[in-house]
């Protein structure tokens, strides 16, 4: 059974639901956490109180995706540690 016949045997509504879940899952686990990582890296020393509170809330909300990328991304502040 090839992929074409398998896809045609599944109802279209089911395929749309699977696509929606994949899209939302990718957004939740990949896109937003990466954007949040880079936003925090670029704004860390210039954030105001409200922005920092919002960012901490987003980190809490998107924590599973942040954990996925945490071992691979390391944004240390410049000038700290051994060079």
From Swiss-Prot:
<keyword id="KW-0618">Plastoquinone</keyword>
<dbReference type="GO" id="GO:0031676">
    <property type="term" value="C:plasma membrane-derived thylakoid membrane"/>
</dbReference>
<comment type="function">
    <text>NDH-1 shuttles electrons from an unknown electron donor, via FMN and iron-sulfur (Fe-S) centers, to quinones in the respiratory and/or the photosynthetic chain. The immediate electron acceptor for the enzyme in this species is believed to be plastoquinone. Couples the redox reaction to proton translocation, and thus conserves the redox energy in a proton gradient. Cyanobacterial NDH-1 also plays a role in inorganic carbon-concentration.</text>
</comment>
<keyword id="KW-0812">Transmembrane</keyword>
<keyword id="KW-0793">Thylakoid</keyword>
<dbReference type="GO" id="GO:0016655">
    <property type="term" value="F:oxidoreductase activity, acting on NAD(P)H, quinone or similar compound as acceptor"/>
</dbReference>
<keyword id="KW-0874">Quinone</keyword>
<keyword id="KW-0813">Transport</keyword>
<dbReference type="GO" id="GO:0048038">
    <property type="term" value="F:quinone binding"/>
</dbReference>
<keyword id="KW-1133">Transmembrane helix</keyword>
<comment type="subunit">
    <text>NDH-1 can be composed of about 15 different subunits; different subcomplexes with different compositions have been identified which probably have different functions.</text>
</comment>
<feature type="transmembrane region" description="Helical">
    <location>
        <begin position="53"/>
        <end position="73"/>
    </location>
</feature>
<feature type="transmembrane region" description="Helical">
    <location>
        <begin position="18"/>
        <end position="38"/>
    </location>
</feature>
<dbReference type="InterPro" id="IPR019654">
    <property type="entry name" value="NADH-quinone_OxRdatse_su_L"/>
</dbReference>
<dbReference type="Pfam" id="PF10716">
    <property type="entry name" value="NdhL"/>
</dbReference>
<protein>
    <recommendedName>
        <fullName>NAD(P)H-quinone oxidoreductase subunit L</fullName>
        <ecNumber>7.1.1.-</ecNumber>
    </recommendedName>
</protein>
<keyword id="KW-0520">NAD</keyword>
<keyword id="KW-0472">Membrane</keyword>
<keyword id="KW-1278">Translocase</keyword>
<comment type="similarity">
    <text>Belongs to the complex I NdhL subunit family.</text>
</comment>
<keyword id="KW-0521">NADP</keyword>
């Amino acid at each position: 059974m090839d992929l074409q016949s398998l896809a045609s045997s599944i109802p279209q509504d089911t395929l749309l639901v699977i696509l929606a879940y994949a899209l939302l899952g990718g957004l939740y686990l990949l896109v937003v956490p990466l954007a949040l990582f880079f936003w925090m890296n670029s704004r860390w020393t210039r954030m105001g109180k409200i922005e920092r509170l919002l960012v901490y809330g987003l980190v809490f909300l998107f924590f599973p995706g942040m954990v996925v990328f945490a071992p691979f991304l390391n944004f240390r502040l410049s000038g700290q540690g051994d060079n």
